[in-house]
Amino acid sequence: AIGVCALFAATVIGAQPSSRPRPYKVVFDLTTDDPKDQAAVLNYIREIRSVNPDTDIEVLMYGRGTSMVVTGRSTLADDVNHALGRGHLSFRVCEIAIRNQKIDKSQLLPNVTTVPDGIGEIVAKQKEGWGDIKVVAH
């Protein structure tokens, strides 16, 4: 999470105060089940939106990161649902991860979608020019 803070600060500091930042596209690569790290991602999203509301953001979860969007397991369900209601944001889960964890798609929070392969999704996003921010447990 510290690395994300440094990158976010550099992005914000690099913007000229009098200019409107150009929208960009970023994917948060989340594999941790630590509620503090998951909450930090939501905070980064709020801060990015406060500076640049047109930025496209995707939170991609695989491994233990899936807990953020599983009904009955997520401690942040209300925050995720609120964030999704503002647009320019998607929460996506790796189908391999949920299959390995025996999670059915029906257990995911509303409006959370799946991708066949989380790592493949990240690679595809990078090819499309998306920034990739790896969120690591601390």
Predicted regions and their residues:
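Bacterial N-terminal signal peptides
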Residues: 2-10
